UniProtKB/Swiss-Prot annotation:
It comes from the Archaea. The gene is rpl2. InterPro entries: NA-bd_OB-fold, Rib_uL2_dom2, Ribosomal_uL2, Ribosomal_uL2_arc_euk, Ribosomal_uL2_C, Ribosomal_uL2_dom3, Ribosomal_uL2_RNA-bd_dom, Translation_prot_SH3-like_sf. This is Large ribosomal subunit protein uL2. SUPFAM superfamilies: Nucleic acid-binding proteins, Translation proteins SH3-like domain. It comes from Cenarchaeum symbiosum (strain A). GO terms for molecular function: rRNA binding; structural constituent of ribosome. Pfam families: Ribosomal_L2, Ribosomal_L2_C. One of the primary rRNA binding proteins. Required for association of the 30S and 50S subunits to form the 70S ribosome, for tRNA binding and peptide bond formation. It has been suggested to have peptidyltransferase activity; this is somewhat controversial. Makes several contacts with the 16S rRNA in the 70S ribosome. GO terms for cellular component: cytosolic large ribosomal subunit. The keyword Zinc does not apply. HAMAP family: Ribosomal_uL2_A.
Length: 243
């Protein structure tokens, strides 16, 4: 009897496929302040959280509330961060996007008002306030796409710290395995043709070959839904002759 493919087991969401909660500190979200409320906090520590590349800034407010938010470039212990509509346009301050001028770089942007920051949270990431209009505020995301947001949504001015982490090479396979494990991702990934026939539909045989069409239907059963799923085209791309 065959075994379920790894992709099917992972889709079920067992404990061995989930991101570890050990080493997690707190949710990196903005505090739930009122829209017109003006608050100031002080950075009391910069901490590293497992599975997160950008450092977290531990902020303490006047009333004793402690919150964690992703740190921007230039953040240091003892620096102040302002939350509110009347805050200065300065790196680290959290302001509604309606009050941020065009061309300003922002990060940790709320996708929906009050969610505490949901997009542009990766290390070294930043978005650009593109324009203001009746339909909302348009942001240019790191991917190059444009997104229209509610003018009340909050964003942090500046660029997130830790941008050079992707340039650091992995000196060993074990280091890469630990990094992927902290994020709940699979490494290394074994090709289907290199596996046995009872483990993967592409496995088995005297030599490594798929042995059948690698394109499968979108509605294929879970045990057979491996390979190129609902591919529009396969093979090498044709280069058009521009002569």
């Amino acid at each position: 009897m065959g075994k379920r493919p790894l992709v099917r087991r992972r889709g079920r969401g067992g404990m061995q496929f989930r991101a570890a909660t050990t080493g997690k500190i707190a949710r990196a979200k903005y505090p739930a302040f009122e829209l017109g409320e003006q608050r100031e906090g002080t950075v009391i520590d910069l901490v590293h959280e497992r599975g997160r590349d950008a450092p977290l800034a531990k902020i303490r407010f006047e009333d004793g509330i402690v919150s964690y938010v992703p740190a921007v470039l230039g953040t240091r212990v003892g620096s102040s961060m302002n939350f509110g509509l009347k805050s200065e346009i300065r790196d680290g301050n959290v302001i509604s996007v309606q009050n941020i001028p065009d061309g300003t770089t922002v990060c940790n942007v709320e996708k929906h008002y009050g969610d505490g920051g949901a997009i542009v949270k990766s290390a070294g990431g930043n978005a650009t306030v593109f324009s203001h209009g009746e339909g909302g505020v348009v942001l240019k995301l790191p991917s190059g796409r444009f997104s229209t947001l509610n003018p009340k949504n909050r964003a942090m001015v500046g660029t997130l710290a830790g941008g050079g982490v992707s340039e650091r090479p992995f000196m060993s396979a074990g280091g890469k395995w630990r990094r992927f494990r902290s994020k709940g991702r699979k490494y290394p990934i074994v090709r289907g043709v290199a596996q046995a026939a009872y483990v993967h539909p592409h496995g088995g045989g005297r030599h490594q070959h798929v042995g059948q069409s690698s394109t499968v239907s979108r509605n294929a059963p879970p045990g057979a839904k491996v390979g190129s799923i609902a591919a529009r085209k396969t093979g090498r791309a044709k280069i058009k002759d521009r002569r």
